[in-house]
């Protein structure tokens, strides 16, 4: 079966738009030093991000996450909660320096149960 010229032309015109939308929305996970490993224990994580850069932060805690939320928003960027276990931080373009935000997570692990506050400190440079 052969594709008509009109359908082929439409696919050529539309396909680049789909590709650019998908690539514009993708963000990578940033390496974090010092992150939570058990429920009920507060922790702090440190990471680097360029001005205007975006990082994904999946919560990797052994067990089941019952709930999570943004506790403190960053002063020099935007923090979004994508789902119960993943957050996305975008640094403001043109800003360089530290930025801090906190998330709260509640759940049950193999040995502990409770609520933890995870504070993340970005070095925007």
Regions found by a protein language model. Give the residues of each.
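Bacterial N-terminal signal peptides that target proteins for export
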Residues: 1-9
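Extracellular/luminal low-complexity segments enriched in Ser/Thr/Pro
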Residues: 86-96
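Surface-exposed or secretory-pathway low-complexity segments enriched in glycine-proline
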Residues: 47-85
């Amino acid at each position: 079966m052969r594709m008509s010229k009109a359908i082929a032309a439409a696919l050529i015109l539309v396909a680049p738009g789909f590709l650019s939308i998908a690539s514009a929305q993708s963000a990578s996970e940033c390496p974090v030093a010092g992150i939570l490993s058990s429920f009920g224990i507060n922790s702090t994580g440190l990471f680097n991000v360029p001005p205007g850069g975006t990082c994904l932060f999946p919560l990797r805690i052994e067990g089941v996450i019952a709930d999570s939320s943004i506790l403190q928003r960053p002063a020099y960027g935007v923090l979004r909660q994508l789902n119960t276990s993943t957050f996305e931080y975008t640094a403001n373009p043109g800003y360089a320096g530290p930025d801090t935000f906190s998330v709260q997570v509640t759940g049950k692990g193999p040995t502990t149960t409770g609520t933890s506050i995870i504070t993340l400190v970005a070095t925007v440079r």
